[in-house]
Amino acid sequence: HPAGGDANVEHLLAALDYAVTLDQVEARIAPDQALFFINLTADEARKIAELTDDSAKNDFRRSVSCVGSTICQIGMQDSNGLLKDIFAHLEEKGIDTRKLPRLHISGCPHSCGTHQIGEIGFHGAVKLVDKKPMVAFILVDGGSEHMGSENFGKMAGNIVATKIPEFLES
């Protein structure tokens, strides 16, 4: 799974170019933006892993977002931009992300970023601050996609987008 769902095109093409030379190997795309190669031998799997060494290293880096308002015509906010800002902020601060949960971010109330099923999810919104509209996201807390404990999270608040990276830092 590429970090944030954004694959490095050169790495992806190298992996696909290698995979087409193999017998019975298939590539499959999962709904959470993951790409799986199936029917590999152990040596072939190691080679694919080597070619895609930019893959996410922990659950937090496997966070997902929809494309957001920069591409989607109905998206209210830039969900993918928010995810990149969060990654950059926490990396800059030296925060160990191995214990943070996977985020699910949608640019609007629709569920393209599956915000309802994340332990922490966000969906695009607007918040009035001093009577001025600000880019914001609704925090959705407590969702689960794990078998046996599936449930939608509850809306917990509306946070100005620029404050979300700091919120996750604490």
Cite the ranges covered by each PLM segment.
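Accessory RNA-recognition modules of RNA-modification enzymes
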Residues: 1-5, 38, 138, 154-157
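Mobile "lid/hinge" segments at catalytic clefts and subdomain interfaces of large enzymes
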Residues: 121-170
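Small-residue-enriched alpha-helical segments and adjacent helix-cap loops
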Residues: 2-132
